[in-house]
């Protein structure tokens, strides 16, 4: 797996090695070809706000956006395609300043929040979304399972990027995350297509 991190945020405390590790783990667990590529861009609030308006027509910043290179169906790739081969999956955009605010409200550190958002972004690259309630429940359950498994994988290797949080907001359901989004001024992750 080739994961490139481009950090243009100017924000302290972003552990690029952790972002690469969690993305590599998640994509591997999802049976993505080991030669696949993805990019994680870490940006400032102004850049994220611009992208959010330009691509989602939503004002203000958000924590994560994903730009898949191809339209995939969860677990199967494109409906008309062969199984995943080596490919460029797409780009994940993270905003650590916004993520830090969410982490503080949720009661865990920014490192965990960025790992959660990277997992969320990887699932979007693979075709998962949260437009419909049943899809949202499936995506958030899978996100939490993968993130829990990543912490277990890190422990088995004797690696700790940040302590595994045990608070209720660390592995949120879709409903929990919606409540958190209301607490952080200026953004959040609305369900795709959700009226503002």
Swiss-Prot record:
Keywords for the protein's UniProt record, in alphabetical order: Cytoplasm, Endonuclease, Hydrolase, Metal-binding, Nuclease, Ribosome biogenesis, rRNA processing, Zinc
Cofactor note: Binds 1 zinc ion.
Any GO BP: rRNA processing
Subcellular location: Cytoplasm
Entries under Pfam families matching the protein: YbeY
Record keyword Repeat present: no
Binding residues for Zn(2+): 120, 124, 130
GO cellular component: cytoplasm
Enzyme Commission identifier(s): 3.1.-.-
Record-stated family: Belongs to the endoribonuclease YbeY family.
Protein name: Endoribonuclease YbeY
Biological source species: Corynebacterium diphtheriae (strain ATCC 700971 / NCTC 13129 / Biotype gravis)
């Amino acid at each position: 797996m080739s994961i490139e991190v481009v950090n243009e945020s100017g924000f302290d405390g972003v552990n690029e090695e952790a972002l690469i590790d969690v993305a590599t783990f998640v994509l591997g667990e999802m049976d993505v070809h080991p030669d696949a590529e993805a990019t994680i861009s870490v940006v400032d609030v102004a850049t994220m706000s611009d992208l959010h308006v330009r691509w989602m027509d939503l004002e203000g910043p958000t924590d994560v956006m994903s730009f898949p290179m191809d339209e995939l169906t969860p677990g199967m790739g494109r409906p008309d395609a062969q199984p995943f081969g080596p490919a460029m999956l797409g780009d994940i955009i993270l905003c650590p300043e916004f993520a830090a605010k969410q982490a503080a409200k949720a009661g865990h550190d920014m490192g965990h929040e960025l790992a959660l958002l990277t997992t969320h972004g990887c699932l979007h690259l693979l075709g998962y979304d949260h437009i419909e309630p049943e899809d949202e429940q499936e995506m958030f359950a899978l996100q939490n399972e993968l993130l829990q498994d990543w912490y277990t994988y890190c422990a088995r290797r004797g690696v700790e990027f940040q302590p595994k949080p045990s608070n209720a907001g660390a592995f949120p359901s879709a409903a929990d995350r919606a409540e958190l989004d209301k607490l952080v001024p200026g953004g959040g992750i609305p369900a795709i297509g959700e009226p503002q």
